[in-house]
Curated annotation (Swiss-Prot):
Name of the protein in its database record: Threonine--tRNA ligase
Requisite cofactors: Zn(2+)
Enzyme category, top tier: ligase
Annotated organism of origin: Pelagibacter ubique (strain HTCC1062)
Alphabetical UniProt keywords: Aminoacyl-tRNA synthetase, ATP-binding, Cytoplasm, Ligase, Metal-binding, Nucleotide-binding, Protein biosynthesis, RNA-binding, tRNA-binding, Zinc
Annotated ranges, domain TGS: 1-61
Amino acid sequence: MPLITLPDGNTIEFPNKVTGLEVAEKISKSLSKQATIISVNEELKDLSFVLDKDCSVKIFTSKDKEGLETIRHDTAHITAMAVQELFPGTQVTIGPIIENGFYYDFSRKEPFTEDDLNKIENKMKEIVDRDVPTTREVWKRDKAISHFKDKGEIYKAEIIESIPQGEDVSIYFHGDWHDLCRGPHLSSTGKIGKYFKLTKVSGAYWRGDSNNEMLQRIYGTSWASQKDLDEYLKRIEEAEKRDHRKLGKEMDLFHFREESPGSVFWHEKGWKLFQKLVAYMRARQEKAGYKEVNTPEILDRSLWEKSGHWEKYGEHMYTSQTPDEKIFAIKPMNCPGHVQVFNQGLKSYRDLPLRISEFGKVHRYEPSGALHGLLRVRAFTQDDAHIFCTEDQITSECLIVTNLILDIYKDLGFEDVILKYSDRPDLRVGDDNVWDKAEKALLDAVKASKLQYTINKGEGAFYGPKIEFVLRDAIGRDWQCGTLQVDLNLPGRLDASFVDKDGTKKIPVMLHRALFGSLERFIGILIENYAGKFPFWIAPLQVVVIPISEEFDSYAKEVNEKINNAGISSEVDLKNHNLNYKIREHSLSKIPLLLICGKKEVDSNSVTIRRLDTNKQENMELNLFLETFSALNKASSN
């Protein structure tokens, strides 16, 4: 007689064992129709799972994250099922869910075409119409290996061979078609619905190793309703228009070359944008009491071994051996260098907190397939800072840092921020009393922000808890940018110490802090958030002065000079093109203001302003223009 406890605390007792679906039916008929999966004592299961003991049960529908993810998982399965029905001989590999969708990797000699994707989609809808029942079987490991080898599915067999001896595996059947899978899954293919779309095909190495075969990865998205699917596809269309790689080319900001993958070639305008952000951050940090330093980009292997990075991060580091057989590594992060700066000279408790910042160039190896414009690079600049403080100062410093980060995001147009707080993992270093202080300090800072936050239990680093700052952009996408991390490990490993009030030497606590994270990545996010139409003070080129004919070139040059002298970035366009051509050209480059100069403007010592994305024009006296827009140009004053 299992006693089922529901999330609201109510209980239902059954005379005999029951399935998850029967529990849903007992609650309500409508719930049983909407149910996708259940959790039993917080473990996700199919609706067909048999409950024969007392347990806690939660029922999920497509409105829940877990329910929607199950729909996407099932859609990945019927993608593979459709492919093998249409293209016999194609081998399946893996098909996980990802954010907003799924993918499935296939081994096939012929490339999938756009026409193939349409055929696969139609076959998937046919499979949904068949409403094929889904069943689960548990097989012995060796049986599963033999079965998939006999079918010619060498990739599935290889996956199962990596499972420990003696461990059983679960196989899900959709009719006769079946796949190795942990589940859970919907009860039939008809439950998936037809609210899916295959979006693209790309290459992917088996197991992410470039030494292995190149597979074909089909991406797709799946939703609970047509409305949700349409809205998502609209967001994707808008995201493509905002793609920073496309806009970066149109706006003449940067480019990449195969000769230096993952490294940015900044053009003049792009570099101006980069420098503006650095100048803005530098000014904000100086006001907040940070001391800016610069540390070497290449450091001896011995320091990386002592810091622990060589063991934990070595595969991502670029190394070089010198003629005297010493091994050096290009830094993938700035923290060991900052500890070396702290260690110069005896430090007292009176010197703390000590806030050290750097715009440090770092290099991290990323597989070529993972590189993505400015958003995923191998060489980038961190707006890194490390705060050395006492245990008693952790709380106040965390509050100060959090407020600074949120204030800067607000200046840059990001007011919708979500915080993710991660506390101690099972495997960790440091005293539990210090962990208590560190966790309370970060959680207090999170709560004081009055922003939405999530708690990720046990997901902190082994050396300390952390906060991640997630920005939501203009089209609803989330970007993880800033971090605040308490470090109870590195200062001790690298012999950092200070003399406390009682004259004893103590190890300082170190706070890792980044606001942008990577400047390159943040610029990519800025471009996409604003679709290249930056706020006036951020824009790399703020004004273009356009004389309507050669007769007014002299006045246009004079205006341009005065604008630049006022601290506003301006150019004058004297090219031999007509006015409409120039307006189109500079509008494509997303210049915020175009100033038209003709006889009327010369006679009245004024300019006619044409703002981006409008046909309206406004005449303004030149001195008033300089006064008005100099005030907006706050990058160097904040």
